[in-house]
């Protein structure tokens, strides 16, 4: 497969930031790393090996972006407003700088595991016009986990379990007709993410948004051993057209 490394200057972040691409045809997938991890996380943990047949067949191509979670979501001793403001600058970098550079006008699928699964969902729900869908594995969708007892509008805007119940019919309609896949195990370290995923399922059902929520077994833990299998399964379904929605 064609693999390319990129480093560019972000106006929003006022720093250089990196990303890597895998493949060059098929449906584009924007991959967010898990908590505090980097753009090379999926490659280091065997995800590219699992997805290589689909990438080499031109069914999907991946753009793996970088994150700054360690300075924002994970910096629990920091000031709430400073942390979420920096996160929003990174969010704007993805929307205003990275996506225009890599999408070539295509609506991408947002994806990730754990914190990356949260980011994938958050980007999709805030900007559905940029995405054809989301594949979120073991995501946590409530900002209160990282910002306990928050009282901040910007944090609210980054907390899908809080803002989605207030979605207007027009907003909910923007989510329809897309590929929405959310998966979580029921094994070790999946209790909190499983509960969060279940709440998200209920909200989307009440909004009348068609989606696929798949809870795997009690032996399925919060790690790449299972995320590799889940990614292979769900992206395989997308490649086959078994779960495909027009953007």
Enumerate the language-model features and the residues they cover:
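Non-catalytic cap/lid and distal C-terminal segments of serine-dependent acyl enzymes
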Residues: 1-247
């Amino acid at each position: 497969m064609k693999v390319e490394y990129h480093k560019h200057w972000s106006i929003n972040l006022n720093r250089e930031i990196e990303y890597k691409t895998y493949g060059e045809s098929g449906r584009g997938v924007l991959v967010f790393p898990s908590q505090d991890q980097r753009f090379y996380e999926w490659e280091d943990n065997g995800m590219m090996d699992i997805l290589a047949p689909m990438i080499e067949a031109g069914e999907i191509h991946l753009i793996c972006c970088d994150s700054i979670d360690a300075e924002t979501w994970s910096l629990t001793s920091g000031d709430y407003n400073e942390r979420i403001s920096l996160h929003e600058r990174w969010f704007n970098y993805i929307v205003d700088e990275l996506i225009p550079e890599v999408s070539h006008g295509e609506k991408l699928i947002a994806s990730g595991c754990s914190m990356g699964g949260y980011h994938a969902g958050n980007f999709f729900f805030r900007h559905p016009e940029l995405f054809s869908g989301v594949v979120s594995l073991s995501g946590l969708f409530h900002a209160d986990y990282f910002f306990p007892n928050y009282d901040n509008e910007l944090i609210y805007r980054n907390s899908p379990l809080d803002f989605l119940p207030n979605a207007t019919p027009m907003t909910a309609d923007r989510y329809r007709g897309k590929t929405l896949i959310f998966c979580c195990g029921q094994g070790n370290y999946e209790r909190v993410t499983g509960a969060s995923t279940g709440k998200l399922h209920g909200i989307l059902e009440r909004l009348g948004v068609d989606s696929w929520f798949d809870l795997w077994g009690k032996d399925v833990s919060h790690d790449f051993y299972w995320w590799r299998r889940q990614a292979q399964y769900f992206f395989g379904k997308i490649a086959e057209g078994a779960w495909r929605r027009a953007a």
